[in-house]
From Swiss-Prot:
Residues 1-145 form the MGS-like domain. GO terms for biological process: 'de novo' IMP biosynthetic process. The keyword 4Fe-4S does not apply. It comes from the Bacteria. GO terms for cellular component: cytosol. The gene is purH. PROSITE patterns: MGS. It comes from Polynucleobacter asymbioticus (strain DSM 18221 / CIP 109841 / QLW-P1DMWA-1) (Polynucleobacter necessarius subsp. asymbioticus). This is Bifunctional purine biosynthesis protein PurH. The IMP cyclohydrolase activity resides in the N-terminal region. CDD domains: IMPCH.
């Protein structure tokens, strides 16, 4: 049973009404510093920790709760007679509830003008010590670190005469240890990223030790293959617009492959937000590769154009829009087998149409342009870490290297093709025209084979490549790749450049009479 609660929070959100409810339940309130002052200002009877310990706060508040009167009350096992006898001998009362959140270290170091001294002063010492003590003794102590837990714990107390179940206490203790581990990991990451000069602005993006924290969203029936187990974890604080922010409206549970493909689709279609002249964009993904991408005046038109690229591969694919999915688009999509459909929102008409196809997984994700801090790739015994491929080359940063200048329509097509090529597995070749992909060659060990594959894909779909734009995610190492795409029908090409044979490739472009652009940026994707 809870009789005494110690409250000391940096996040004051909801603490006053929570403390009032505790007081109304007959619970004694103990507090420190600013929290005690706030409670007193709201006419709540509160005992200062310094009155409890008979020792004043000292060292600018660095020492206030590190005392046996506090930790004895938290750590004593109520079912151990010798523990209770020791408390009685030393005049220590039990503390049955601890409500704490820690100094805002992460928020402090996120500030551009943060000094090393600011960072160090926001390393909490007493808070984690109390949290760990209370969580260790979760059999007897209820410990809360988040305002979101106030209401459910209060409800349980009111229903059970101030008793909180062991199940609840254990769940809260698990949350505490995850939180303190993350907190200490953040401190270690920050300090090990600093150089000898301790310059906040010059700290490395890659600390000497890297501590990561994720929380489990779900366990899955299996992983990439049925014999593999799997689970999906998300960042503690996913960035704006990330797949992990999805809300599933209907459909079966997402599989491992669904989530991997959905991420590819969503990241690709997001790249058209604000870059498509206000047009709708649609991306169709199969095995993490785009098999159709298009823009149009509506979601329906964008989908129809994207679907034309490779109808057979689109079967059982993942579809994403950068605008709301309306009834017209939903009606057309419902004619096909679709695993997952993603959009910023769905109209009521679209929802009604898909309600008849309950196996289709509908995901709503708010649009956003933020990127993960890091991309990761697990290797044997280690982890490759890099910044995300977030660079968008602007038109004025590109260089026309051919004798012939591209026409405005060719420039638009090349920009479109370049945006798509970034999301195709290397080696990537993408043909585009009039805001839609015509043929995509992905994942071949030879660039010339990817070029041939893209041409074959277009031919199989009955699409003409005459006058199309072609994008290559990396430079053409030899002229044979360029010869293949030009013979296929391309009138212009966009590529990074940087080959030892650039002069030979440029000469080939001039020989063919096509326009060619160098971006200076490569987009390998493995």
């Amino acid at each position: 049973m809870i009789r005494t609660a110690l409250l000391s929070v940096s996040d004051k959100n909801g603490i006053v009404p929570f403390a009032k409810s505790l007081h109304e339940q007959g619970i004694k309130l103990i507090s420190t510093g600013g929290t005690a002052k706030l409670l007193a200002e709201n006419n709540l009877p509160v005992v200062e920790v310094s009155s409890l310990t008979k020792f004043p706060e000292m060292l600018d508040g660095r020492v206030k709760t590190l005392h046996p009167m506090v930790h004895g009350g938290l750590l004593a096992r109520r079912d151990f007679p010798e523990h209770m006898a020791a408390l009685e001998e030393h005049g220590i009362d039990t503390i049955d509830m601890l409500v704490i959140n820690l100094y805002p270290f992460n928020e402090t170091v996120a500030k551009e003008n943060c000094s090393f001294e600011d960072a160090v002063e926001n390393i909490d010492i007493g808070g984690p010590a109390m949290l760990r003590a209370a969580a260790k003794n979760h059999q007897d102590v209820t410990v809360l670190i988040s305002p979101e837990d106030y209401a459910p714990v209060l409800a349980e107390m009111k229903a059970n005469q101030n008793v909180v179940s062991y199940k609840t206490n254990l769940a809260l203790a698990k949350k505490v240890f995850a939180h303190t581990a993350q907190y200490d990991g953040s401190i270690a990451n920050y300090l090990s990223a600093l150089g000898d000069d301790l310059d906040h602005k010059a700290r490395s993006a890659y600390p000497e030790t890297l501590h990561l924290a994720f929380e489990k969203v779900q366990e899955m029936r299996y992983g990439e293959n049925p014999h593999q187990s799997a689970a999906f974890y998300k960042d503690i604080y996913p960035v704006n617009g990330a797949l992990a922010n999805y809300k599933q409206l209907q459909g079966k549970e997402l599989s491992y492959n669904n989530i991997a493909d959905a991420d590819s689709a969503w990241e690709c279609v997001k790249s058209f937000a604000g870059n498509s002249g206000g047009a709708a964009a649609c991306v169709i993904i199969k095995h993490a590769n785009p098999c159709g991408v298009a823009v149009g005046a509506s979601a329906l038109e964008a989908y129809q154009k994207a679907f034309k690229t490779d109808p057979s591969s689109a079967f059982g694919g993942i579809i994403a829009f950068n605008i709301p999915c309306d009834g017209a688009a939903a009606q057309e999509i419902s004619k096909q087998f679709v695993e997952v459909l993603i959009a910023p929102s769905f109209t009521d008409e679209a929802k009604a149409i898909f309600a008849a196809k309950q196996n289709v997984r509908l995901l709503e994700i708010p649009l956003g342009n933020a990127f993960n801090t890091f991309d990761f790739k697990r290797v044997g015994g280690g982890l490759l870490v890099q910044s995300p491929d977030a660079k968008n080359v602007l038109q004025n940063e590109m260089r026309v290297v051919s004798q012939r200048q591209p026409t405005p329509s060719e420039m638009n097509d090349m920009m479109f093709a370049w945006r798509v090529a970034k999301f195709v597995k290397s080696n990537a070749i993408v043909y585009c025209s009039n805001g839609m992909t015509l043929g995509i060659g992905a994942g071949q060990m030879s660039r010339v084979d990817s070029a041939r594959m893209a041409s074959i894909k277009a031919e199989n779909a009955g699409l003409s490549l005459k006058g199309s734009a072609v994008a290559s995610d990396a430079f053409f190492p030899f002229r044979d790749g360029l010869d293949v795409v030009v013979n296929g029908g391309a009138s212009c090409a966009i590529q990074p450049g940087g080959s030892m044979r650039d002069d030979e490739i440029i000469a080939a472009a001039n020989e063919h009479g096509i326009a060619m652009i160098f971006t200076g940026t490569r987009h390998f994707r493995h």
